[in-house]
A protein has these predicted regions:
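Conserved small/polar residues in nucleotide/adenosyl-binding loops
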Residues: 207-214
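Phosphate-binding loop of NTP-binding sites
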Residues: 1-120, 124-133, 184, 190-191
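Short glycine/threonine-rich catalytic loop with a Thr-x-Gly-x-Asp
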Residues: 174-185, 209
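Beta-strand->loop->alpha-helix junctions that form or flank phosphate-binding loops
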Residues: 1, 40-42, 120, 131-152, ...
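Short beta-strand segments
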Residues: 61, 144, 166-170
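Glycine/charged-rich beta-loop-alpha catalytic/anionic-binding loops adjacent to active sites
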Residues: 7-9, 163-172
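Acidic-glycine-rich active-site phosphate/pyrophosphate-binding loop
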Residues: 150-166
């Protein structure tokens, strides 16, 4: 995976929880758009029936960045989402502080010209290189967030807010509350890399959850 991220624009999703859903949703948003992507996922995409998507003409590769055994330190992300940093794998890391330090080091690997999209409120203090933009996201606040959330009749509809745009009336294909926040992160990654507003809206509507992980 390290070689792949050095030879393409790696769009990596890291975090204790939510990375499989977020990376699979991001991959779907890219793959069904004019931008396209290759993707290596930690769960099976129900949209495509596989955890591997190929799009040779696209410069982008979506990857689930796994913190287990510090394997994500081999990556060279162009952009990365960090969803959560709740301590895990303490048999390897030993302490909460060592776990957070591993994520801090991971943020130093994001390449200049790229971006970090980090969930607002995490204990992690990023340490990005000069030239790396940092954005926050969450369900209700941050540079990227949701507004006008409507839940009922078996569906969730949101307005997606970005620093430079607003996409109204996005229907989430999987109407589960946590997918609002995961969806915001995936949409942020897509928006920053040229997926159009209408492609984001259509992609969210048609997205189905991965299996079995998260």
């Amino acid at each position: 995976m390290g070689t792949i991220t050095r030879s393409s624009k790696g769009l990596c999703v890291a975090g204790t929880h939510g990375k499989t859903t977020t990376s699979t949703m991001a991959a779907h948003l890219f793959h069904q758009s004019h931008v396209g992507c290759t993707a290596f996922l930690g769960g099976i995409s129900k949209n495509y029936g596989t955890n591997l998507l190929l799009s040779p003409a696209s410069p982008y590769t979506v990857i689930e960045a796994d913190e287990f055994d510090r394997s994500f330190h081999w990556l060279s992300p162009y952009m990365s989402v960090i969803t959560s940093t709740d301590p895990d794998h303490l048999d390897i890391y030993g302490t909460r502080e060592a776990y957070l330090e591993s994520f801090r080091h991971y943020t130093t690997l994001i390449q200049p010209g790229g971006a970090l999209i980090i969930r607002k409120g995490l204990a992690l203090q990023p340490d990005v290189q000069p030239g790396v933009r940092t954005y926050t996201y969450s369900r209700d606040e941050g540079d990227f967030h949701a507004e006008n959330i409507r839940i009922g009749n078996g569906e969730i509809i949101i307005d997606f807010i970005a620093p430079d745009t607003r996409i109204n009336d996005i229907r989430l294909g999987v109407p589960i509350g946590i997918n609002i926040e995961n969806g915001v992160a995936a949409m942020a990654l897509a928006h920053l890399n040229g997926v159009t507003d209408e492609e984001i809206r259509q992609g969210c509507l048609l997205y189905t959850s991965p299996s079995p992980r998260d």
